[in-house]
Regions:
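Substrate-binding clefts and catalytic carboxylate motifs of secreted carbohydrate-active enzymes
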Residues: 1-143
Length: 143
């Protein structure tokens, strides 16, 4: 199916939905696309990365759903993306927390998608500063 689209894109969540290190996972995925599919040479985008956090849940243990874990996971994901030769861009999923339908109750605390770098009231989580610092540190960042 890579023969038809002009761009190859993937939504990946290393360190969130699986424990694979972000750089290892992305390199294996990118190499597979380049070597084994019709996506060779096409622009490659990471169209979703992220991890969930409950606003205000902070713990030095860096457990899932904590702001510390989210900031650390996103930092590792973005570092992997910007370090991957041939990767053309990335989207952080998502800017703000948002409600989801009731059927997600078992995996979504508060019936929310809590992957925002700010909460539903636009209060920044720790990951907000992490994302800002990483993007502002890029040579291509335009202020």
């Amino acid at each position: 199916c890579f023969g038809m689209p002009e761009v190859v894109s993937y939504n990946i969540y290393p360190l969130w939905y699986h424990d694979t290190q972000a750089d290892v996972y992305l390199k294996e995925l990118y190499d597979w696309v380049q070597e084994k599919t019709e996506g060779t040479g096409k622009p490659f985008l990471v169209t979703e990365i992220g991890a969930g956090a409950i606003y205000g849940y902070r713990t030095p243990a860096e457990v899932k759903w904590s702001e510390e874990y989210q900031a650390s996971a996103i930092q590792k994901q973005l570092t992997a993306v910007f370090g991957q030769e041939g990767c053309s861009g990335v989207y952080v999923w998502q800017f703000c927390d948002g409600r989801v339908c009731d059927s997600w109750f078992g995996t979504r605390p508060r019936t929310m998608n809590n992957k925002g770098i700010v909460d539903e009231y636009r209060r920044p989580k720790l990951s907000y500063e992490t994302v800002k610092r990483i993007f502002r540190g890029l040579d291509t960042y335009v202020n």
